[in-house]
Amino acid sequence: MSKKLPEDFIFGGATAAYQAEGAIKIDGKGPVAWDKFLEENYWYTAEPASDFYHQYPVDLKLCEEFGINGIRISIAWSRIFPNGYGEVNPKGVEFYHKLFAECKKRKVEPFVTLHHFDTPEVLHSNGDFLNRENIEHFVNYAKFCFEEFSEVNYWTTFNEIGPIGDGQYLVGKFPPGIKYDFEKLFQSHHNMVLAHAKAVNLFKKNGYHGEIGMVCALPTKYPYDPNNPKDVRAAELDDIIHNKFILDATFKGEYSKNTMEGVNHILQVNGGKLDLREEDFEELKAAKDLNDFLGINYYMSDWMAEYDGETEIIHNATGNKGSSKYQIKGVGQRKANESIPRTDWDWIIYPQGLYDQISRVKKDYPNYKKIYITENGLGYKDVFEDNTVYDDARIDYIRQHLEVISDAIKDGANVKGYFLWSLMDVFSWSNGYEKRYGLFYVDFETQKRYPKKSAYWYKKVSETKEV
């Protein structure tokens, strides 16, 4: 039996500036840390990516043709302020005005993110968000955008504070490539939520047009053996690292007793001390009820088991199934439940985890107001044939997740839209161009777009509101 989604539900597609735009060195754009990091550590760069900088009229026309009425776009901070602050780059400002005008022309609502993993190099090399000065630079950049781009109706401050700290200071797959540093991880999370709160407080105080929220990656954590208290504790601690610390700060304006006990335990075992100031919490408390929405990025869940050894994390960047490892001293280890499917990159496919995560937000953070699923999708080594991709596995993945969203709405959650990652194939931070997510196949040499089977299926769902 099919399941319904609301008539006003947004069926969107998601992009990000650095992963889609290309044009990383033209029209006055300043460098970001990724430019050098990719050149030095990987076999690919973000040039030309999907050339969205030039191809956006094509992509937005496809949105209109395929029933996609929302798009996630991020502004490249260094395209507006090449050094992160100071002089404004007029060509960057002009580009985003043209982009938003094209969105309006095609009747596609832009949900605009201010920071999607791409701090300008000048600020990044000066400590990124570990340096409190950069919090103020971010707020000033946000203020400029709120005032300049008044045509935008939906703003998000940050995309995925969790994976930023995780990538930069735990796994080391993001610049500056530091591993296993929990002090930096939690401090980065705290300072970024503080920057978010300051931007939200400014937005509301100045009465800017539109709505504002934050996008969080929320992978659901389960105990491998629910009857083993040590497995239960491992899941709780991993949830604090990736989810609860950030959600508490955003929606409670403080860290709950349980959260701080977990953080202090992790820091005691692994070393480190946090700088949490009284004035930080004044700012966080002032903002906690002002978020207009929460964006949830959900791809997978994890099962956690007890673990006594040293920390070792191996990131599977090549699609060699089973090659990843995640075990943290004093926390636990990820242990795959063999009965649950996973991708070649060891991402566990578990739609129920999205339902459980939405339910958790509804229960623990009742001031959330509304939710958008701002990313969800299946990365695949797509086979291009007959000028398309027969991506039935992707269709199945999206269908299952839309079904549990329908269930969550029926059970009282206020979920207003879904943005598939990704609109078209884009550059992937730690996988380059092999791992594809898009509704539209991109030939990265010619930049031609081809609708996949999933694009036609998604069009039908957006028209009928049925899955």
UniProtKB/Swiss-Prot annotation:
Family of the protein in this entry: Belongs to the glycosyl hydrolase 1 family.
Activity sensitivity to pH: Optimum pH is 7.0-7.5.
A GO term from the CC aspect: cytosol
Recorded name of the encoding gene: lacG
Organism for this UniProt entry: Leptotrichia buccalis (strain ATCC 14201 / DSM 1135 / JCM 12969 / NCTC 10249 / C-1013-b)
Active site, UniProt feature: 160 (proton donor), 375 (nucleophile)
Binding of D-galactose 6-phosphate, residues: 19, 116, 159-160, 297, 428-429, 435, 437
Regulation: Inhibited by both galactose-6-phosphate and ATP.
Protein name listed in UniProt: 6-phospho-beta-galactosidase
Gene Ontology biological-process annotations: lactose catabolic process; lactose catabolic process via tagatose-6-phosphate
